[in-house]
Amino acid sequence: MDVFVKILSDFGFTRLSSSLHVPIVVHCMPGAGKSSCIRALLKADSRFVAYTLGVPDPCNLDGLCIKAFTGSVDLKYFNILDEYARYNGDASDFFALFGDPVQSPPRNLYRAHFKAVLSKRFGSCTAQLLRELGFEVESTKEDLVSIRGLYDFDPVGTVIYYEKEIGCLLRAHSIEAYEPEEVVGKTFETVTFVTAENHIPAESRHLVYQCLTRHRSVLHLMTPDASYTST
């Protein structure tokens, strides 16, 4: 337990509870260093084994990687499950659960023992936009955010959307674009998010959040009237 707590502290995770019990729940923003933290745990103590319901690590010579979860674990290890929000089974076999309940709303939401709100992926302009939209996030990096009209700007970089009508519009203009599910676990230098709304629909909040957090340096939003609000 001491190794686990120390490494989470080293990676900037804030402890929220003085009492810890298994499974230990860790929530964080995109780009908070979750995967790097899990890899550090694997390297620090051979009792840890990590699985994910997201994109697994490629094989390496050390044999230390976050593996694809296939449905069962070896109970003699301290098993960690990443992207636990995608899991619908019994979590009692896991020592720790890592995930982002905002990005992937779980069927079973656990109260967090640790959290991290500082993103090392995107910058302060994106963080400010996300806070204005009601998300808890911070960043000390620099980046660029612009909000453009739907027909006033040509999409650049990786184009992301979540509405079917926008997908049809982009295809009609021969623009290659992706839905959130297609870019899970991926990061791009520049992203253009195209939407038919000027605000976040409550039922699509998690999808918007995913679309707004895939970039490192530049984010362009294209909306009907070049504005975007939480309501």
Curated annotation (Swiss-Prot):
GO terms for biological process: symbiont-mediated suppression of host innate immune response; transport of virus in host, cell to cell. Residues 1-123 form the (+)RNA virus helicase ATP-binding domain. InterPro entries: (+)RNA_virus_helicase_core_dom (IPR027351). GO terms for molecular function: ATP binding; RNA binding. Pfam families: Viral_helicase1 (PF01443). Homodimer and homooligomer. Interacts with capsid protein. Interacts with host AGO1; this interaction targets the host protein for degradation, thereby suppressing the antiviral RNA silencing. One of its GO terms (cellular component) is host cell cytoplasm. It comes from the Viruses. Coiled coil: none annotated. Its main location: host cell. It is found in: Host cytoplasm. Keywords: Host cytoplasm, Host-virus interaction, Inhibition of host innate immune response by virus, RNA-binding, Suppressor of RNA silencing, Transport, Viral immunoevasion, Viral movement protein. Residues 124-231 form the (+)RNA virus helicase C-terminal domain. TGBp1, TGBp2 and TGBp3 seem to act together for cell-to-cell propagation. TGBp1 is the main movement protein that physically cross the plasmodesma with the viral genome. TGBp2 and TGBp3 would facilitate TGBp1 function. Belongs to the Tymovirales TGBp1 protein family. Transports viral genome to neighboring plant cells directly through plasmosdesmata, without any budding. The movement protein allows efficient cell to cell propagation, by bypassing the host cell wall barrier. Increases plasmodesma size exclusion limit. Acts as a suppressor of RNA-mediated gene silencing, also known as post-transcriptional gene silencing (PTGS), a mechanism of plant viral defense that limits the accumulation of viral RNAs. This is Movement and silencing protein TGBp1. It comes from Chrysanthemum virus B (CVB).
